[in-house]
Amino acid sequence: MRIGSYQLRNRVLLAPMAGITDQPFRRLCAYYGAGLTFSEMMSTNPQVWHTEKSKLRLAHSEDLGLNAVQIAGSDPLEMAQAAAINVEYGAQIIDINMGCPAKKVNRKLAGSALLQFPDLVEKILREVVSAVNVPVTLKIRTGWDKSNRNCVQIGKIAEQCGIQALTVHGRTRACLFEGEAEYDNIKAVKQAIAIPVIANGDIDSARKAKFVLNYTGADAIMIGRAALGNPWLFQAVENLIEHNSISQMPSLKEKCGQILRHIQELHQFYGEQKGYRIARKHVAWYLQGIQPDSVFKQTFNAISDPKEQLIVLEDFFNLILDKKNVRTTT
């Protein structure tokens, strides 16, 4: 699949997720096969462009592949300025968020709230596309609510404005993340436009990914929540849809090693004052796939020292692997 002049390594993408798709997590997903990863959503408010938090969200390295940055806002000129600034910082793809269902985003008329105003959508897309010399993509939902599904209309507007690829999450804003993804509506969008369409929503296995690709005719799939605590999912999906082969999941030993490295990188990336707090939610997600009924989560969440976190986590993994007293962290 191509986005503008860029050939992606495969058709399996990691969704941009606020508070999750930082550099350490994107690196892990890319290692296991994500063909493209996106930064966390960046506000187009000029007051936050140069903050430390924004710099962390924009952090990128070559091993992550293409530098794709997602922006969110509602003012066309402000959106265009933000896109241009991000390109100056190294963004190779700009993604526009018109899919986020969060109230705090929608109250500012950003994210999926914009789907209620197709004329404003068009103004934003035209301004952003004309402001940068890199591909611009768009992420939407199927509409604001079930009575106002307009994803086909928005898709046509996007194509006319020069958007290079369109991601459709198969739910309305009103649905949030409840119910089942509307693959029929993603299929309708794909049939209505010529630009690449990326299917998103409820893709939690390699078989589901293959089904969604075949059913919708989409050019690629995007994985979001299913990757939490499960970055190796990309490996299984890539092998099935690109090579028609079923791959073995990484061994428990490999998973434990990767989790330890991920937590250590979070400590280094965010610093001692913040890294241990970010690590807690990731460990909780990882435990769901290793020992979902474990009380270890409470133990881990009570720790505020990064080094102690690593020691306790490795001891826990050693107990699971029956390798007691074999510690590599100090």
Swiss-Prot record:
EC supergroup of this enzyme: oxidoreductase
MF-aspect GO terms: flavin adenine dinucleotide binding; FMN binding; tRNA binding; tRNA dihydrouridine synthase activity
Active site: C100 (proton donor)
UniProt: FMN binding residues: P16, M17, A18, Q70, K139, N200, G201, D202, G224, R225
CDD domains, alphabetized: DUS_like_FMN
Presence of the UniProt keyword Lyase in the record: no
Catalysed reactions, as listed in the record: a 5,6-dihydrouridine in tRNA + NAD(+) = a uridine in tRNA + NADH + H(+); a 5,6-dihydrouridine in tRNA + NADP(+) = a uridine in tRNA + NADPH + H(+)
SUPFAM superfamilies for this protein: FMN-linked oxidoreductases
Pfam families registered for this protein in UniProt: Dus
The family this protein is said to belong to: Belongs to the Dus family. DusB subfamily.
Protein name: tRNA-dihydrouridine synthase B
Organism from which the protein derives: Haemophilus influenzae (strain ATCC 51907 / DSM 11121 / KW20 / Rd)
